[in-house]
Amino acid sequence: MKDNCILTAESVTEGHPDKLCDTIADAVVDACLTQDAAARVACEVMATAGKIIAAGEITAAKIPDIPAIICRTVREAGYGGSDYEVEVITHEQSPDIAEAVCGGTETGAGDQGILYGFACDETKELLPLPVVLAHRLTRLLTDARRQGIIPGLRPDGKAQVSVEYRSGVPYRVAAVVVSCQHEEELPLPELRRDILCHVIRPAMQELPLDEHTEVLVNPSGRFVQGGFEADTGLTGRKLMVDTYGGLVPHGGGALSGKDGTKVDRSGAYMARYIAKNIVAAGLAKRCTISFAYAIGKAQPVAVTVDTEHTGIYSDDVLEQAVRTVFNLTPDGMIGTLGLDQPMFQKFCNYGHFTHADAPWERTDMTEVLECACRAKDMGVSHR
């Protein structure tokens, strides 16, 4: 990261069409795991005006009522749940993949993949400030709609925050963009005033707006038609919203719609868990963890740690400690983080790494990591 720069992150509300598809897919995963903790799920959702399609591979003791799940989830997001034709196209996991994943003594990775996790000491969430602020904006936008604080708001919306850094530290908010769906009768000047008062200013606790901050509310003007009526939604299209706002590398795999044997999900969560514990322990100010997996193989083929020269130990020592302390197989990650339990819909919105009660957000391994680093460092020093 450059010492002097502007970094930007975005977030979307739970009524955004792509994010609602993610939420539906995770609701399906949760329903499968509720009935069968060993369920194998890879669910994709596409939705457009008047139609929602759920498709993928599901191997479970019992297939849940997916149309009912879809209608309920759409209603919970603030739309009419019975206004769509629903089509479900599923089949069981490929026997070749099933054998590769489950045929050995250990569960193998459900696919190849490159996963990244990140943490920094910039905020109490141990995330970059633009990411935290963007998600806070969309949470407050949804709260303002649900609680009637701003009458006339509708479910679809998004936000973007640009933060200016000086000497590597957040200095000021350079720009805020909020776009929110609204009822036709709501005057735009009134909407802009209310969003500034009830959403934007309360969200900017760490860095209040200054006289030079550019604030844009519905910069395109009218935003009456939203959701699936305005844009086709698809799972896996909000990867940066789900993770680190584009400020950290991403391997390209989506999180939602997948059970824990898919390392796109379990590996990304585990990488965040490890990076957060490293930073929480004071072992580094910034930390990126990366894993690479091969389909059918339990152990990662690569593990790397990059602290951007902010660590109190070398990255090599930290990598050895990570390999020693954590079980990085799919079984190990599922067991450590409880990923065979139905929980994913709860953490699907407003970033997967902003929820303090998510298992991968725990900082319960700091002391173990510190001890492992000391031991590894002594071993390296005495070679």
What are these regions (language model features)?
Residues E10-V12, H16-C21, T107-T123, V224-V248, ...:
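Conserved phosphate/anionic-ligand binding catalytic regions in large, soluble enzymes, centered on
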Residues A42-A60, I295-Q299:
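Short, charge-patterned binding micro-sites
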Residues T8, A68, R75, G81-Q225, ...:
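Glycine-rich, mobile lid/loop segments that gate access to catalytic sites or pores
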Residues T48, R286, A292-R383:
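Internal helix-turn-beta structural module
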Residues A39-C43, G157-V163, T213-V217, L283-A294:
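A short glycine-rich, hydrophobically flanked beta-strand micro-motif that places a catalytic Asp/Glu
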Residues L186-A280:
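Glycine-rich anion/phosphate-binding loop at the beta-strand->alpha-helix junction
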Residues E14-L33, T123-R139, D259-G282:
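Alpha-helical support elements that line or immediately flank enzyme active sites
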Residues M1-A42, V368, A372:
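N-terminal, positively charged regions that mediate nucleic acid binding
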